Amino acid sequence: MSETFIHSVSENQIIVNDLENNNDYDNEDNVFIDSSVYNQECFMEILKKLEDGKPIHEVVRFTSHSSYTHTIVKTIQGLFLYVVLKSVNIYGSYYDFQRYIGPSMMIGTYACPLYRVQYRINKNDSTGAIIKYSNNLDECETYFNHLCKVFNVLTKRLSLNSICCGVGLSDSFYLMNTKTIKKSSRTRISFIIGNSKYSQHRKLDGVINDVNSFYCALLGCSFHSDNIVWLIDSDLRTFYDKWYTFLQLVQSFQSYIEVVVYYAGHGRSDNGNLKLIMTDGNPVQLSIIASTLTESIKNSDSLCLFIVDCCRDGENVLPFHYPIESFDDKKNIAVLFACKYGELSYESLELNAGIFTRSFVKTITERKNNNISTICNLTDIAIKRIYKNYSGCSLIGNFDCSLLEF
């Protein structure tokens, strides 16, 4: 899949080129890129309607029936949604967008970044799209920041409070007043790694879906995208480079924080030590990276949770009750496994995802506005949704899990 980039950006023109063959329309893996001239008259007319107090859904309806190019209309609509949602800190999954915006608006707005993260736009439905489905939120934000005039005016000149307080974005869906949106008083950061393509081990097809769903679940649980570091198909060197970048992020916080580290991929148990296998076959010992994390945290009351969706099988398989000393003697740190010692973590061929991660994500997404008594209970609920009376997960650690409010 070829990558696109902004070739030049000015006040009057936006040009996006394809790195491989410079075609406007490549293949079904790419979206249509319209390199038409940006029409300032269109933007200024829309801006005037907003500043005159017109409801945003009427303005969007105006743009949809205008004679301006499809790309410009969708870009502006996407920017509206992006700026408004960012102003009230609503980051979440596809279902969160349905709740606040409505599916009809989402489907019609190709430039809406979070929608594009999770849902692929196919060849027949891609006319006018400006960002490929594979771009993550940070890449989308970088692109939007290049639209200097549009972005600056929307963020500085429009009254976002009046837009957010009950003004409809579509005929039947309304944004909640910003005062009713619960914002977390706790800083939450996360490190996500998913290894799928191995040089010496079986490929894990469901890992990418696991990572994407877990990432979106965190966004819906008051994790800001700027505080999430994620890594796909990493060798040993790349992992440590990213890990120490993450530790620098952790060290930048003086106050209480909650840290979630998620891993999906191959793993093995060696003399009681769980090792995460990188794509080049080299292992990373979980207890070692846990120690580096706890040493980097400056507030002793902070919580650390490792969620590991991998096999714990190996030549030296230990019974389930065997403690992991490096975790057991640490305050406020725990590790949640998808399976017990000597067991395998399974993928669903039908769902193309890990069974544990899918169930876990579904459960915390549904319960994100409620207090969770214990991670163990939560995981039991998740697993039993698929396998009756199955309780293969395990939690090792000694902190009060009720402190974690997803």
From Swiss-Prot:
UniProt signal peptide: none
GO annotation, cellular component aspect: contractile vacuolar membrane
Top-level taxon: Eukaryota
EC number(s) per entry: 3.4.22.-
Keyword Hydrolase among record annotations: yes
Consequences of knocking out this gene: No change in morphology and persistence of induced-cell death.
Active site: H266, C311
Annotated region (Caspase-like), positions in chain: 193-374
Similarity annotation: Belongs to the peptidase C14B family.
Function description: Not required for DIF-induced autophagic cell death and necrotic cell death.
PANTHER family tied to this protein: MUCOSA ASSOCIATED LYMPHOID TISSUE LYMPHOMA TRANSLOCATION PROTEIN 1/PARACASPASE, MUCOSA-ASSOCIATED LYMPHOID TISSUE LYMPHOMA TRANSLOCATION PROTEIN 1
Protein name as annotated: Paracaspase
Gene source species: Dictyostelium discoideum
Highest classification ranks of the organism: Eukaryota, Amoebozoa, Evosea, Eumycetozoa, Dictyostelia
